[in-house]
């Protein structure tokens, strides 16, 4: 009797073992796993914000999503997941640094990297200030309701502390410049702080943003040369302001319905169906100002070719944008990084086509000689 019972138990154990080895669908377990069939322990819901089987992405949003969870609200508050704003702040700095370079020479790479760091920090600080001012409005706008302060992921006190940290680091970058540039950079803080309030009192907040975002067109030149040359810097600054009026009006069309409901103002609400005509005027003014800046800087053919390409790109944006479709407005807005990079490339190539000054030739000869002797 015991022998028959033991035999039955042994057969049962063998059956269980065979079923386990063959996996949940009658296949060998090794084959099941290699084919990606989920086992019992694998059938958990994926973590929020992830999708099983998605290819590794190196986009800014993916990098932010992969950061430690406690840091993610702060990175989003800086808009590191949407770097287009940092590019639009940084590119006018590169134009100015490029125009200030010695004839026949590349721009100062140290200054470019320094201003790049400053652009990340000051864009983050500006977004923090903006979201602190607008936290009650952001809750009422579909596109901005999930911003960290509006959503309650970061408290007002935490945002103040974070803002202080960003401004402290930005001050460290600013102190690497000459005294003239330090004073000029400090003056821009007033624009950064007051810009978010402008949309409450005037239909021209995009103009205030242009004055703020293109400050680097003045600061870059002074950082290289020690002071501003009005003949070059002012037309360049004006062209940047016109550029901002174009791209930020397109951007503002995304939120025009919500803005109208909650009482915020913008050029999108002011221009409405006349947007193309207004933006065309801004585009012509931008191209004219860039041409004047180039003439006063002694620029060459590649620069003017780049200015023509910028004009063509802007014309395409203005006459193809669907101001009633938010997705198209966003696409046209983000394409302005290409505009800024085209102009920077034209500045660099145009400067390289200039004949080097005697001072630059002497400096290069000294550098080459020191490299050969070392």
Swiss-Prot record:
Tell me the function of this protein: Mediates the second step in the final reaction sequence of coenzyme Q (CoQ) biosynthesis. Catalyzes the prenylation of para-hydroxybenzoate (PHB) with an all-trans polyprenyl donor (such as all-trans-nonaprenyl diphosphate). The length of the polyprenyl side chain varies depending on the species, in humans, the side chain is comprised of 10 isoprenyls producing CoQ10 (also known as ubiquinone), whereas rodents predominantly generate CoQ9. However, this specificity is not complete, human tissues have low amounts of CoQ9 and rodent organs contain some CoQ10.
Q: Which gene encodes it?
A: Coq2
User: Where does the record say this protein resides?
Assistant: Mitochondrion inner membrane
Q: Keywords in UniProt for this one?
A: Isoprene biosynthesis, Membrane, Mitochondrion, Mitochondrion inner membrane, Transferase, Transit peptide, Transmembrane, Transmembrane helix, Ubiquinone biosynthesis
Which reactions does this protein catalyse?
Answer: an all-trans-polyprenyl diphosphate + 4-hydroxybenzoate = a 4-hydroxy-3-(all-trans-polyprenyl)benzoate + diphosphate; all-trans-decaprenyl diphosphate + 4-hydroxybenzoate = 4-hydroxy-3-(all-trans-decaprenyl)benzoate + diphosphate; all-trans-nonaprenyl diphosphate + 4-hydroxybenzoate = 4-hydroxy-3-(all-trans-nonaprenyl)benzoate + diphosphate
- Return the transit peptide range from the UniProt record: 1-34
What is one GO cellular-component annotation here?
A: mitochondrion
**Major place of localization?**
mitochondrion
For this UniProt entry, which segments traverse the membrane? 84-104, 109-129, 149-169, 173-193, 201-221, 231-251, 278-298, 333-353
The record's annotation in InterPro entries points to:
HB_polyprenyltransferase-like, Prenyltransferase, UbiA_prenyltransferase, UbiA_prenylTrfase_CS, UbiA_sf
- The name under which this protein is listed is 4-hydroxybenzoate polyprenyltransferase, mitochondrial
Is the Signal keyword given for this protein?
no
Q: In the Enzyme Commission scheme, what number(s) does this protein have?
A: 2.5.1.39
Q: Gene3D superfamilies, from UniProt?
A: UbiA prenyltransferase
Gene Ontology molecular function:
4-hydroxybenzoate polyprenyltransferase activity; prenyltransferase activity
Q: Which residue intervals are topologically Mitochondrial intermembrane?
A: 105-108, 170-172, 222-230, 299-332
Q: Which family does it belong to?
A: Belongs to the UbiA prenyltransferase family.
């Amino acid at each position: 009797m015991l022998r028959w019972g033991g035999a039955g138990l042994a057969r049962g154990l063998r059956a269980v073992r065979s079923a386990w080895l063959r996996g949940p669908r009658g296949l060998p377990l090794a084959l099941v796993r290699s084919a990606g069939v989920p086992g019992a322990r694998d059938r958990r819901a994926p973590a929020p914000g992830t999708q099983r089987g998605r290819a590794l992405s190196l986009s800014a949003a993916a990098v932010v999503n992969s950061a430690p969870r406690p840091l993610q609200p702060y990175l989003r508050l800086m808009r590191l997941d949407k770097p287009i704003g940092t590019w639009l702040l940084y590119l006018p700095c590169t134009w100015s640094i490029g125009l200030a370079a010695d004839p026949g020479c590349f721009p100062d790479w140290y200054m470019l990297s320094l201003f790049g760091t400053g652009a990340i920090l000051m864009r983050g600080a500006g977004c923090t200030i903006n979201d602190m001012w607008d936290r009650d409005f952001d809750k009422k706008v579909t596109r901005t309701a999930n911003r960290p302060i509006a959503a309650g992921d970061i408290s007002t006190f935490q945002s103040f502390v974070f803002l202080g940290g960003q401004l402290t680091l930005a001050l460290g970058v600013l102190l690497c410049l000459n005294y003239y540039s330090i004073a000029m950079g400090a003056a821009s803080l007033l624009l950064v702080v007051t810009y978010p309030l402008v949309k409450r009192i005037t239909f021209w907040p995009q103009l205030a943003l242009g004055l703020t975002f293109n400050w680097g067109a003045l600061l870059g030149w002074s950082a290289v040369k020690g002071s501003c040359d009005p003949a070059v810097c002012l037309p360049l600054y004006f062209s940047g302001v016109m550029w901002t009026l174009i791209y930020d009006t397109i951007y503002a069309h995304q939120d025009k319905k919500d803005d109208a409901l909650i009482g915020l103002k913008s050029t999108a609400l002011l221009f409405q169906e006349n947007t193309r005509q207004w933006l065309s005027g801004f585009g012509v003014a931008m191209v004219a100002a860039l041409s004047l800046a180039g003439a006063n800087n002694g620029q060459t053919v590649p620069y003017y070719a780049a200015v023509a390409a910028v004009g063509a790109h802007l014309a395409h944006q203005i006459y193809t944008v669907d101001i009633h479709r938010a997705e198209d407005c966003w696409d046209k807005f983000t394409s302005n990084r290409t505009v800024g990079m085209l102009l920077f490339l034209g500045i660099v190539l145009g400067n390289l086509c200039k004949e080097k000054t005697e001072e630059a030739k002497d400096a290069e000869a000294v550098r080459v000689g020191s490299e050969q002797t070392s």
